[in-house]
């Protein structure tokens, strides 16, 4: 969210933007990486203690011998598309000209760019809510619920008419003020998918690595 807002405020009008406009953000990113390196370098992190093992015959099994782990890996790949797909393709569709080869709605690119921030704000809200209730319900119940909700929202986004509009907040990067614009309600449904995607990674990981025993470390590395 901060990246969308910061880059938008620095670049402003995309039509007149120059590479030099983004340089402050690059220096900020460099400073963050240097700070993180210094902290990690001077922090003594306790590594997991692993007992020395005698040389044994090669294990015939691995984490990939478990069916639910392999399904979890597949689910993570699909989840990745669910997480990054909506903000990317929503922007392309809303800003594409109506007479283009792949026609869109021809909306203002500056406003449409802020919808990515709205999507990730929904993800942030979902993470907070998921963190609060995660200890009270099982990962299976949570994943099942958000998956059904995501399917319903995606279907709504595909089927609802473009003429049905709803107001959605955005950011005027030039003046850093909140603005409201109208988007199809189906697009707003796609944005709400962020609420569902926010808790999927942790839930899928827990379900996929459950009961793996000594193969859990290797499974975690695979993820």
Feature locations, PLM:
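Helix-loop junctions on the cytosolic side of multi-pass membrane transporters
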Residues: 40-52, 163
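Small-residue-mediated transmembrane helix hinge/kink sites in multi-pass secondary transporters
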Residues: 4-12, 128-135, 206
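Juxtamembrane helix-start elements in MFS-like secondary transporters
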Residues: 21-22, 104-116, 182, 186, ...
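Extracytoplasmic gate region of multi-pass secondary transporters
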Residues: 4-8, 63-121, 125
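C-terminal transmembrane helical hairpin of 12-TM major facilitator-type secondary transporters
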Residues: 137-204
């Amino acid at each position: 969210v901060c990246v969308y807002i910061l880059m938008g405020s620095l670049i402003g009008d995309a039509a007149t933007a120059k590479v030099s406009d983004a340089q402050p953000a690059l220096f900020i990113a460099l400073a963050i990486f240097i700070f993180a390196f210094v902290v990690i370098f001077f922090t003594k992190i306790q590594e997991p203690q692993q007992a020395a093992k005698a040389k044994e015959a090669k294990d015939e099994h691995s984490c990939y011998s478990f069916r639910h782990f392999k399904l979890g890996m597949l689910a993570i790949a699909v989840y990745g598309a669910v997480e990054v797909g909506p903000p990317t393709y929503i922007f392309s569709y809303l800003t594409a000209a109506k007479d283009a080869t792949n026609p869109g709605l021809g909306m203002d690119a500056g406003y449409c760019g802020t919808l990515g921030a709205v999507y990730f704000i929904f993800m942030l809200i979902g993470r907070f809510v998921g963190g609060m209730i995660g200890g009270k319900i099982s990962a299976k119940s949570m994943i099942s619920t958000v998956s059904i909700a995501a399917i319903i929202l995606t279907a709504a986004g595909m089927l609802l008419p473009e003429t049905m509009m709803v107001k959605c907040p955005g950011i005027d990067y030039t003046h850093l003020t909140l603005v409201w614009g109208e988007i199809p309600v189906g697009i707003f449904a796609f944005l709400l998918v962020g609420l569902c995607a926010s808790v999927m990674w942790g839930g899928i990981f827990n379900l996929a690595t459950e009961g793996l025993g000594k193969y859990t470390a290797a499974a975690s590395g695979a993820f």
